Every structure is written in structure tokens, then in C-alpha cells.
Amino acid sequence: MANIRVFTFNMRTDAACDGRNAFSAERSAYIEKEFPKYEADVIGFQETRPEMRQWVIDHFPAYTVCGIGREADLQGESNIIAYRTDRFDLVSLDTFWLSDTPQRPGSRFATDQSSCPRICTVVTLRCKENGRLFRHYNTHLDHVGAFAQAQGISLILNRMVSDYQTWQMPVILTGDFNVTPESKVYATVNGFDGCGDALVDVSADVGFTFHAYQPEKTQEKIDYIFTNIPADPTKSMKATDNEDGIYLSDHYPVGAIVSLD
């Protein structure tokens, strides 16, 4: 049995308005210093701009980084997936847009969506320890439109069903969903059984994840790890590190340990 430590990590785009917490100010160095102690095997990132993607490649050489930007020119923010090269082989990689034309770069839903295109990055990985395959879907749902959120997650789940009919392998879904556990989107995903065993929110016990650099005031649970791979939710975790007001992000990275046999 291979235990795999999976994380979802909204890295927060580089924004000067964050002051010392801007990625290009003090935060990137803090991530490099603190995040490795969590020994993540697979990480689904959100809000990684091209320079941040390159930073991950340069500063975390033990990982292979996959994914493209969400804009029409394949630049802009991405939902990259990083996996430990010594533990996994890449079998397949894809990106699709959350829109009525998911293969058209930069596309988005025509109504009730922000100006931001939204994407889902998908990798199939083979575990070197036991040869088992699994698929990892990583996304960032819209932060404005409830319709776009609902349509986006429906598109992802339909894709998972289609993929399962071809691949018949277990799945992991990570991301910043921009909705709370009381939402219809959450209810749609948690317990979804269209791709084999039902999806379970193995991050359910970690508490709030979005804090906007002020956790004493802002507390929202919007970051999730769903999977149908066996896992113990009580062993899930979130990275609450901060040092003199510097955080890993305005979201807490969230992790879970799944057991692939």
C-alpha cells in the first residue's frame, strides 16, 4: 500500500496590495522555507501566474510541474499540479476550460461569470511503488457567479464520468471552489458516485481555509480535497504557519493522506 500526501494550495497571485505578504516581497521565501516540512507528494495549486509557476520549478526541483495558463494565449493564472518525480510517472496531461467550449483556450460561460476564464488541469499518474494509476483533477471555480460555479463543477464531474468509463481508475479532485460546505455545489460533489466509489471530502475536518491574512476576522472553508481513494479524514491537515505576520498564502494549504493499494 502506498500512502500519498495530497495538498491543495491556493498560492495567491502576486499582488502589491498584499504588502509584505506579496509573493514577490517576503512570502515566496517563506513558502520555500516552511512548506517543504509537510512532505507533499502531489500538490494542486491555484492562482499561479507564469513567473510563479517558474518559481515552483526552480525552488522545488524534486517535483515535476504540469499545467498551462487559463487565457487564450495559454498564459495568465494556472492551476498547476506538481508531483514528486521519484514517486510517480506521468501517464497523461490535459487542461480544459469551464465553458460551453471546453477545448477553446480562454473560453468562459457567457453569463453570470467574472471576467476570469476558469480551467481544470488533469493528470494521470502511475505510482512507482505499486504500479497503480490514479487521476488528479485540480480546479479553481469562479468567485462571482453561482451559475458559473454550478456549471463548472457539473462539467468537471461529467468529464470525470467520461474518463472513468475509459480509464476505470480512482480519482482525486482538489481546488479552491469559492463555496462553503453549505452550498449546492458542495452537495453535488460530496458523495458523487459517477466514477466508481463515491467521492468523499477528506478535508472536512480541517476547519476554515480562507483567512485573507487576518484569520482572527476572516474564516471561510472554500478549499477542498475530494477522493474515492481510501483515506482517514482525521489525519487531514492545514498549514497554518505564519511568522511575524507573513503567511504561506491568504488561504491555508490543505493536505490529506490517501492510501493507494
Language model region names:
Residues 6, 10, 31, 82, ...:
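Generic structural signal for small/hydrophobic residues in well-ordered secondary structure
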Residues 3-18, 91-96, 122, 132-142:
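Active-site-proximal beta-strand elements of phosphoester/diester hydrolases
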Residues 1-59, 70-77, 260-261:
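N-terminal, active-site-proximal structural segment of metallo-dependent hydrolase catalytic domains
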Residues 147, 151, 161-171, 178-261:
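Metal-dependent phosphoester-hydrolase catalytic domains
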Residues 42-133:
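Structured beta-strand-rich core segments of catalytic domains in phosphoester-bond hydrolases
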Residues 4, 41-42, 134, 170-172, ...:
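Short, Asp-centered acidic motifs that coordinate Mg2+ and/or phosphate
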